């Protein structure tokens, strides 16, 4: 690469709003041509007046909340919630004050059945992320009212690379794969190095087929304890007790 090309890449890399430890491990992927095409697509949609979620500053919130070396468990989602004010960059999570989506209600039901933790009065899973649970969607953006609108636009290659990097460079992680989409995305995870937990999606359409009763939260902690990473505190504080300094920052709301 000539000096001009190096300078362009250096300038582009400096603009990537990715947490520093993740940038060191996967940031180069964002410099690929398909990611530049994705960036152009997102700009064009916004210029056309389309509402894209989550806000730009929160697209990489999962990485900001859970640095690379702090990851203990990974929950894979598909794409962000497509209602106004819901998505804030963490899969299955919604901002405080938003109604609880049906899938999240079922996650809370399983949490109570498995660990005896009562359902909180909000749907913000940021405390999990801060404790080492990477809440990663396969596709990091969506359009208002159009689920899956940004599938096939380039995000999947990046998030595949994220999963592959964790698979290769970390050991003793727990991957929680709920539904066929997440299971297909995690099919190459080395089960000799990590624990892979599979269950149907927590959607009301499938939760009764095996998600409810899967006991993934306790199984996760059992494995983490055995491998010296420390268990995840799956409890969630009431909305009034959520850390306001965090919630007012760019990684949450």
UniProtKB/Swiss-Prot annotation:
Gene Ontology CC terms: cytoplasm
Keywords in alphabetical order: Cytoplasm, DNA damage, DNA repair, Hydrolase
Superkingdom classification of source: Bacteria
Main localization category: cytoplasm
An individual GO BP term: base-excision repair, AP site formation via deaminated base removal
Compartment(s) where it occurs, according to its Swiss-Prot or TrEMBL record: Cytoplasm
Enzyme class, first EC level, given as a word: hydrolase
InterPro entries: UDG_fam1, Ura-DNA_Glyclase_AS, Uracil-DNA_glycosylase-like, Uracil-DNA_glycosylase-like_sf
A molecular function (GO) term: uracil DNA N-glycosylase activity
Reactions catalysed, as given in the entry: Hydrolyzes single-stranded DNA or mismatched double-stranded DNA and polynucleotides, releasing free uracil
Record bears the keyword Transcription regulation: no
Catalytic residues (positions): 79
Pfam families: UDG
E.C. no: 3.2.2.27
Family: Belongs to the uracil-DNA glycosylase (UDG) superfamily. UNG family.
HAMAP family in alphabetical order: UDG
Role this protein plays: Excises uracil residues from the DNA which can arise as a result of misincorporation of dUMP residues by DNA polymerase or due to deamination of cytosine.
NCBIfam families: PRK05254.1-1 (NF003588), PRK05254.1-2 (NF003589), PRK05254.1-4 (NF003591), PRK05254.1-5 (NF003592), ung (TIGR00628)
The name this protein goes by in its record: Uracil-DNA glycosylase
Source organism: Xylella fastidiosa (strain Temecula1 / ATCC 700964)
